[in-house]
A protein has these predicted regions:
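A juxtamembrane structural motif centered on a specific transmembrane helix
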Residues: 2-19, 35-40, 377-431
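Interfacial transmembrane-helix termini
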Residues: 19-23, 37-59, 77-87, 97-117, ...
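Interfacial loop-to-transmembrane-helix boundary motif in multi-pass membrane proteins
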Residues: 81-89, 106-115, 124-149, 167, ...
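Hydrophobic, glycine- and aromatic-enriched re-entrant/interface helices and adjoining loop segments
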Residues: 160-178, 248-338, 360, 364
Length: 431
């Protein structure tokens, strides 16, 4: 009987570890390259007088070169076969680069550097994640550094747009949003702590860490990011416990706390009083959202073309209104494709979680993909007034170096779930 059970276990394990046929990355890369060249041509054709043609050509040439170099090295020399996650990241980053270059030609190199730094974060983090023992050892130092970074930001950050979440260095030369970097650390610490949950002490430590992070963000008045952190905490807790009742109690407690804050801190409620009333505040608080609704639909299925939109003239168009710009200048088809890519990352994480090497990789990947999808939902539905507007960025596409590095860090957590990512485990699977 025991032999039969053992045999069944081996069959189940083999079924879980079975190779799934990877996508044809070369065809998709060629298609993506053609799309990016088309974007560059549009910017050169429709750009204003401030467009420096040499800069545009150089930026896109460098970006495409980096893309191809990455795939040639990892597919040709390192013999990797699965590139679904990287294709999505490069596709979205390319759209962000095109929008930023089109609206702010002088910031083209800055955005390109942000993407390169993000790719660097992706590669380094993948190496760190290759060893689960290394991950567990780094858990506490990462947690301490994360709290320290948020406290430092709270003390020294400048108040920008009502929130104290930016560290400005060199008279505006460089600005860092530490909460973006802590997003990756938040999932890293949570997944590593709950990887082998053996005591209430470990769970308590993570709860203290999570509450501290959310509390500091709330004090900074960065409510959108605080909501994202809370959502991620709920996802991680559910993935580890699977207890719906516990999750319900956590959410109920948070709701009661939120109502209390809105009651005793009226200035917080005032930030959301235009929700569902943007047309009544069309020239004040609802100015950006009203323009987004008007201009984004004018793009139709195929868009007006880069440089031809009107939304680009609105304040923070490449940050807070990025999805509207995609709709207006790229069209509904590309905009819908962008949304589908975030859904695809969630599906990818769930699909590969059954064959991950440990619960850390399953928790980290599912939490990271859920965070990206939730943030996208907040951005899209907030800008269109279906949800209260929090001003969160659209992952990969909104302009910003901190956000870009965070997004590449999150996709590293997603990528690590696939055993084919690491050569030594790839051999085990084939065997």
């Amino acid at each position: 009987m025991s032999k039969k059970i053992q045999k069944d276990k081996k069959k189940t394990h083999k079924r879980k570890m079975r190779y799934r046929r990877p996508v044809n990355w070369l065809f998709l890369l060629l298609l993506m390259t053609a799309f990016q060249i088309f974007c560059a041509i549009q910017i050169l054709t429709n750009g204003g007088e401030d467009i420096v043609k040499g800069t545009i050509i150089a930026v896109f040439a460098l970006y495409i070169t980096v893309e191809w170099t990455y795939f040639i090295v990892f597919a040709g020399f390192l013999r990797r076969k699965s590139f679904e996650v990287e294709l999505i990241a490069f596709f979205l980053s390319g759209i962000g680069l095109a929008l930023t270059t089109s609206v702010y030609p002088n910031k083209a190199y800055t955005q390109l550097i942000a993407i390169l730094l993000g790719i660097g974060v992706f590669i380094v983090l993948l190496w760190i994640l290759s060893d689960i023992d290394r991950v567990v050892k780094l858990r506490m130092p990462v947690a301490i550094l994360s709290i320290a970074a948020l406290v430092f930001t709270l003390i020294f950050a400048k108040n920008i747009n009502g929130a104290r979440n930016w560290i400005v260095i060199g008279n505006g030369l460089l600005s860092i949003q530490t909460s973006e970097i802590v997003k990756v650390a938040f999932i890293f610490v949570g997944a590593a702590t709950l990887e082998t949950l053996q005591s209430t002490k470990l769970l308590t430590k993570y709860i203290i860490f999570a509450v501290t992070c959310v509390g500091l963000l709330f004090i900074m008045k960065d409510f959108g990011t605080a909501l994202i952190f809370f959502f991620t905490f709920v996802i991680i807790a559910f993935l580890r416990s699977g207890d719906i009742k516990t999750i319900f109690l956590i959410c109920a407690g948070a709701l009661i706390g939120g109502i209390g804050v809105l009651t005793f801190k009226p200035y917080v409620a005032n930030r959301f009083n235009s929700y569902c009333h943007i047309w009544e505040f069309a020239d004040t608080k609802g100015y950006q959202q009203v323009r987004l609704l008007i201009y984004s639909v004018s793009g139709g299925l195929f868009g007006l073309g880069l440089g031809n939109g009107k939304l680009r003239g609105i304040y923070a168009s490449t940050e807070d209104l990025a999805f509207g710009m995609v709709c207006e200048e790229f069209g509904i088809i590309i905009a819908f494709t962008v949304l589908l890519t975030f859904v695809a990352l969630v599906v990818y994480s769930i699909r590969y979680s059954v064959a991950s090497r440990s619960s850390f990789y399953s928790i980290a990947a599912c939490a990271a993909s859920a965070l990206l999808l939730f943030q996208t939902a907040l951005h899209v539905f907030g800008a269109t007034d279906l949800l209260p507007w929090t001003g969160v960025t659209l992952p990969f596409i909104s302009r910003g170096g901190s956000s870009m590095m965070c997004c590449w860090g999150l996709v590293a957590l997603i990528k690590a779930i696939d055993v084919k990512t690491y050569k030594r485990y790839d051999k085990v699977v084939k065997g």
